[in-house]
Amino acid sequence: MGLNITNRQGFLLVAAACAGAIGFALFAQYQLGEEPCPLCILQRIGVMAVGALALLAALHNPGKTGAKVWGGLMTLAALSGAGVSLRQLWLQSLPADQVPQCGPGLEFLMESFPLWEVLSKVLKGSGECAAIQGRFLGMTMPFWVAVFFAGVIVWTLWLVGRRRRG
């Protein structure tokens, strides 16, 4: 038997999950007072990229080959986002004396440096990215974002790798 879902429905489900994840991130920021660090913002961009690709894939409603292309793009975006999440988890695991100093905000960096230099500085991390603001079931937000990206990757690979029903 199996799950009878079309590629379009599967892509729409990913887009909806991404919208929900961004909605929760905004809730955490504006209602719970958890200010996002530069790595958090990059993770949000990753979620939005996956969501936008999923929505475009659903609107395009491609055949088997096209679905694999869209799925590959979504997987690459999710892998990038997961990499940022794992980087932040690593920073959060450092002993206090090894945490990098806090740096300038992302807005200042974007105004002052070229994009590649901004990405390099942000990915090196800073003190605010190592700070743990809150936990859910004992785990930090970057952990749950990494789990989200892993789920998207597994779902997408399953969706485009199965025998297509519609």
UniProtKB/Swiss-Prot annotation:
Record's GO cellular component terms: plasma membrane
Broad class of the protein's primary localization: membrane
Cleavable signal peptide: none
Keywords in alphabetical order: Cell inner membrane, Cell membrane, Chaperone, Disulfide bond, Electron transport, Membrane, Oxidoreductase, Redox-active center, Transmembrane, Transmembrane helix, Transport
GO molecular function: electron transfer activity; protein-disulfide reductase activity
Cysteine disulfide links: 37-40, 102-129
Keyword Glycoprotein among UniProt keywords: no
HAMAP family registered for this protein in UniProt: DsbB
Protein name from the UniProt record: Disulfide bond formation protein B
